[in-house]
């Protein structure tokens, strides 16, 4: 049984060890590299509507 996937460098390792229903703080969900943040932190609330 493989515990960690090959792309574990993209996300914190605790996500893969998470027990269903356990709360993860936002600090553990944020990417380590700032180059990923524009892609992962796109919130529909913060984006401009397409009709503007």
From Swiss-Prot:
One family name in Pfam for this protein: Crystallin
Record keywords, A-Z: Eye lens protein
Domain of life (superkingdom): Eukaryota
UniProt keyword Protein biosynthesis, yes or no: no
InterPro entries per record: Alpha-crystallin_N
GO terms for MF: protein homodimerization activity; structural constituent of eye lens
Family assignment from sequence similarity: Belongs to the small heat shock protein (HSP20) family.
Function: May contribute to the transparency and refractive index of the lens.
Record's subunit section: Homodimer. Aggregates with homologous proteins, including alpha-A-crystallin and the small heat shock protein HSPB1, to form large heteromeric complexes.
UniProt protein name: Alpha-crystallin B chain
Species of the source: Turdus merula
């Amino acid at each position: 049984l493989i515990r960690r996937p090959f792309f574990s460098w993209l996300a914190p390792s605790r996500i893969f060890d998470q027990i269903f229903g356990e709360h993860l703080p936002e600090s553990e969900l944020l990417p380590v590299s700032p180059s990923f943040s524009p892609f992962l932190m796109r919130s529909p609330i913060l984006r401009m509507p397409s009709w503007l």
